[in-house]
Regions:
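Short coil/turn segments at secondary-structure boundaries
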Residues: 42-45, 136-139, 155-156
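Short, structurally constrained coil/turn elements
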Residues: 8, 35, 101-103
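Classical protein tyrosine phosphatase
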Residues: 6-8, 85
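Short, small-residue-biased leader/transition segments that mark boundaries at the very start
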Residues: 1-5
């Protein structure tokens, strides 16, 4: 039998903030009722609450099917919360996946939109959490990620020069 995340990490808590497909919202409400005290779902958006979540969380799970830019992962990194994202659009561009051989990365990612790959990314993140040295390094790298216009403008300037 394959061990599920909640069995392997029975002290983990999960907080969901946001909205989406109605079937997923219903699933989260049912899971909240089933796992009282371990899972909480806030369907909708609340700016003040979102900043409390960013500040208090260790990880941000963003399994988006499509995400042209995404700000949540960048805000989370600034707070020191490591994103776990699906490799799409702006999420792929802004989150550097953890490399266990070099120790580099600003979060965790998975390629395909399926539960198996998402679970594997979550398990890798949770294994890193158990190692304070690795976790501290990842948090620092995430907090130091540069999303400024300075970097973007340099890249555009180089592109324009190349085109000339």
């Amino acid at each position: 039998r394959q061990m599920c995340i909640r069995d392997r990490y029975n002290d983990m808590q999960f907080f969901m903030l946001g909205s989406g497909d109605k079937e997923y919202e219903s699933f989260m409400r049912e899971a909240e009722a089933r796992y009282k005290g371990r899972l909480c779902a806030y369907i909708g958006y609340n700016e003040e609450l979102s900043h409390c979540v960013y500040a208090g969380a260790d990880f941000l799970l963003m399994p988006s099917r499509f995400e042209p830019c995404g700000l949540s992962q960048m805000i989370a990194m600034r707070y020191g919360t490591l994103p776990i994202v699906r490799e799409t659009g702006g999420l792929k561009d802004s989150v550097k996946p953890y490399n266990k051989f070099t120790g580099e990365g600003t979060g965790f990612s998975f390629a395909d939109f399926n539960a198996h790959e998402m679970k594997d990314a979550m398990l890798l993140a949770l294994d890193c959490y158990k190692n304070p040295v690795v976790m501290s390094s990842l948090v620092r790298q995430a907090m130091e990620a540069d999303f400024s216009f300075d970097r973007s403008s340099e890249e555009y300037a180089m592109l324009y020069l190349w085109m000339l």
